[in-house]
C-alpha cells in the first residue's frame, strides 16, 4: 500500500521545485501536474503513480523500463545515466529529474510524496552497537501496555499496521521508511519505533527524518569492514548523525567516547541522560539484581515525588546488560508521554523474539538459551550473565560466523566463548558466498588449546549433538547443563549465495529437540 489518504496531492512539478530549491536539480524533462502517490527504487515493486529512483552502481535501463511499464510517472537519476535513460523518458512521456545525488533525492522527496506523515506519528530512533533491538521491543511493549499501538522498523521485524514481514536489513532505504510511517498514520498507529543502523545514517536513509526522540545506547568496534565502514571513525561519525534532527536526545552515560556523544547530542532541543549507577544522570538505575531469569533494579529520576529508594522495576528478561536498554526505553516512553504504570507493566511482561529466549527440558536437566548474539560485545555480555546466573552449570555453545563480512569475528568469538564453555560446536550461519566449512575451520583455528570443539555444519544436527552431549557427557548432578544456540534466534531465513533460504529457526529446533533422551 503506497497511498496516503490525505487531501494534499503531490505533483511531479512540486517535486521538481523542491529539488531545485535544495540545489539538487541539474535538469528536468516533461515536468507537469501529474499526481505522484508513492516512491520506489526496486523495479519489481512499483505501483502506478510512483516516482522511481534509479539507484545503484549496477543500474540498468531495463530496470527503468519495468518501472515505467508498472506505471511510474517520473524518475530520478544522476547525470551519468542520462544518456542511457533519456530515450525511455521520451518514449513513455514520464518526467525525468536529473540530480546531483540520488541518495540525497531519496531523502528529500518521500516526505513530500507521503504528505509529511511524521506530523501525525511520534518517531523514536535507537542506535547503538548492541541492544538496539531489545530496547526497541521494550519500548514497543511499554507503548502497548499504555493501550496504544506502535509501528516498528527493526532488524527482527517490520510492522506498520499494513505491512508486516521479517526484516533482512536493520534500516530500510528512505522511501521505504517514509512509506512505513505513512502506513502507521493510515492504520492509526500513534508512534513508530525504529532501530537505526550506522549504515542507514551514513547513506542518508534517515537524513530528512525528524526524530521526536533519538537514543544512543553504546559504541563498539564491530561493524568495521571494507563493505560497511572502513574505519572506526567513519562508523562513529555515522552513528552520531542520529542527533542531527532530533527534538530530544537520550544518551547512555555508560557508553565509550561519552564526551563526544554528549557534544553531538547538544544540537537537540532537550537532552536526557541515563546510566546504571550514574547518580548524575536524569534517569538512573541502582541495586541491579538477578532473580532467576529476570532482573530487578531501582529506578531514580522518573517521578518528582519518588522516595529515596526509587521505583522498583522488574524486567522479564535475563542479562543485566539489559538494564541500560530498559533505561533507554523508559526515557523514550516518558518523552512521548507514557506514565510509570504502563512502563512497569510493559517491562515485566516483555518478550523479545530471539533474545535470551529460555527453553527448559521437562526434567529440568537441560536449559537452552536461544540468543541473537553474533559479535564480540554481545558474546561477552551473554556468556558472563549466563555464568552469573548458573555458576555451577556446564555450558555448551553452538555458533558460527557470517560469510563475507566482519572477518575479525572468527578470531574474537571463539576467544570470548572459550573461558565460559565446556564444549563449542561450530555450525553454518549465513554463509553468503563463502564456503561454510572454511568459515567454521577458521573459527576452530582460534579456539584456545584446552577447549573441546567440533564442527557440525548442519544446524539441526549441531543442536541435536549439543543436547546429546548435555545429557551424556557434560553433566553436573547439582546443576542443569546450559546449551546456548547463538546468532540466528527465531530467524527462519539463511543467507546462502544471493538467496535467503527458509530454515527451521533455532528457537523451533530447541523446542522440538530439548526433550529427546534416546540417542542412537
Language-model segments: residues:
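Short, flexible loop segments at boundaries between secondary-structure elements
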Residues: 224, 501-520
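Glycine/threonine-rich flexible loop motifs
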Residues: 62-63, 203, 224-231, 406-408, ...
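Phosphate-binding loop of NTP-binding sites
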Residues: 104-253, 257-269, 390
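Short internal beta-strands
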Residues: 69, 73-79, 249-253, 396-399, ...
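Acidic, Mg2+-coordinating active-site environments of NTP-dependent enzymes
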Residues: 83-89, 186-187, 202, 212-368, ...
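N-terminal leader/targeting and accessory segments in enzymes
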Residues: 1-108, 284, 314, 318-320, ...
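Short glycine-rich anion-binding loops that position phosphate/pyrophosphate groups of nucleotides
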Residues: 57-58, 198-199, 220-223, 255-256, ...
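Active-site beta-alpha connecting loops in nucleotide-dependent enzymes
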Residues: 56-59, 352, 384-449, 458-459, ...
Amino acid at each position: 500500500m503506497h497511498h496516503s489518504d490525505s487531501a494534499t496531492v503531490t505533483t511531479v512539478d512540486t517535486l521538481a521545485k523542491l529539488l531545485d530549491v535544495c540545489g539538487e536539480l541539474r535538469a528536468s524533462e516533461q515536468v507537469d501536474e501529474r499526481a505522484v502517490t508513492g516512491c520506489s527504487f526496486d523495479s519489481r515493486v512499483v505501483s502506478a503513480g510512483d516516482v522511481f529512483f534509479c539507484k545503484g552502481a549496477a543500474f540498468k535501463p531495463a530496470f527503468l523500463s519495468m518501472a515505467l511499464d508498472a506505471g511510474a510517472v517520473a524518475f530520478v537519476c544522476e547525470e551519468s545515466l542520462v544518456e542511457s535513460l533519456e530515450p525511455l523518458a521520451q518514449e513513455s512521456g514520464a518526467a525525468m529529474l536529473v540530480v546531483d545525488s540520488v541518495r540525497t533525492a531519496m531523502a528529500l522527496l518521500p516526505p513530500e510524496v507521503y504528505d509529511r506523515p511524521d506530523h501525525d506519528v511520534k518517531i523514536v530512533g535507537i542506535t547503538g552497537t548492541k541492544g538496539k533491538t531489545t530496547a526497541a521491543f521494550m519500548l514497543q511493549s511499554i507503548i502497548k501496555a499504555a493501550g496504544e499501538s506502535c509501528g516498528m522498523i527493526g532488524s527482527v521485524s517490520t510492522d506498520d499496521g499494513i505491512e508486516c514481514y521479517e526484516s533482512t536489513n536493520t534500516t530500510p532505504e528512505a522511501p521505504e521508511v517514509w512509506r512505513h510511517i505513512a502506513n502507521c498514520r493510515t492504520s492509526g498507529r500513534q508512534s513508530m519505533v525504529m532501530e537505526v543502523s550506522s549504515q542507514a545514517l551514513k547513506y542518508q536513509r534517515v537524513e530528512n527524518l525528524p526524530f521526536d526522540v533519538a537514543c544512543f545506547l553504546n559504541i563498539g568496534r564491530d561493524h568495521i569492514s571494507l563493505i560497511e565502514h572502513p574505519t572506526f571513525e567513519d562508523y562513529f561519525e555515522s552513528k552520531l548523525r542520529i542527533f542531527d534532527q532530533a527534538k530530544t536526545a537520550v544518551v547512555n552515560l555508560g557508553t565509550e567516547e561519552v564526551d563526544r556523544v554528549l557534544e553531538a547530542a547538544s544540537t537537540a532541543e532537550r537532552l536526557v541522560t541515563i546510566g546504571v549507577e550514574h547518580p548524575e544522570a536524569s534517569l538512573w538505575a541502582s541495586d541491579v539484581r538477578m532473580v532467576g531469569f529476570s532482573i530487578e533494579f531501582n529506578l531514580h529520576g522518573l517521578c518528582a515525588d519518588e522516595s529515596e529508594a526509587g521505583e522498583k522495576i522488574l524486567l522479564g528478561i535475563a542479562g543485566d546488560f539489559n538494564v541500560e536498554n530498559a533505561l533507554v526505553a523508559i526515557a523514550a516512553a516518558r518523552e512521548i508521554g507514557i506514565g510509570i504504570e504502563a512502563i512497569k507493566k510493559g517491562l515485566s511482561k516483555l518478550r523479545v523474539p530471539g533474545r535470551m529466549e529460555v527453553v527448559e527440558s521437562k526434567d529440568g536437566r537441560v536449559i537452552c538459551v536461544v540468543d541473537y548474539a553474533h559479535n564480540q560485545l554481545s558474546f561477552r555480555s551473554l556468556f558472563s550473565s549466563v555464568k552469573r546466573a548458573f555458576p555451577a552449570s556446564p555450558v555448551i555453545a553452538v555458533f558460527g560466523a557470517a560469510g563475507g563480512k566482519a572477518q575479525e569475528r572468527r578470531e574474537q568469538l571463539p576467544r570470548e566463548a572459550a573461558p565460559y564453555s565446556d564444549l563449542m560446536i561450530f555450525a553454518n550461519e549465513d554463509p553468503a558466498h563463502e564456503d561454510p566449512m572454511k568459515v567454521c575451520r577458521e573459527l576452530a583455528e582460534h579456539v584456545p588449546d584446552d577447549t573441546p570443539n567440533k564442527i557440525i555444519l548442519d544446524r539441526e544436527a549441531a543442536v541435536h549433538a549439543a543436547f546429546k552431549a548435555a545429557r551424556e557427557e557434560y553433566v553436573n548432578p547439582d546443576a542443569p547443563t546450559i546449551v546456548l544456540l547463538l546468532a540466528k534466534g527465531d530467524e527462519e531465513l539463511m543467507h546462502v549465495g544471493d538467496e535467503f533460504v527458509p530454515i527451521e529457526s533455532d528457537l523451533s529446533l530447541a523446542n522440538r529437540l530439548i526433550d529427546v533422551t534416546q540417542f542412537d
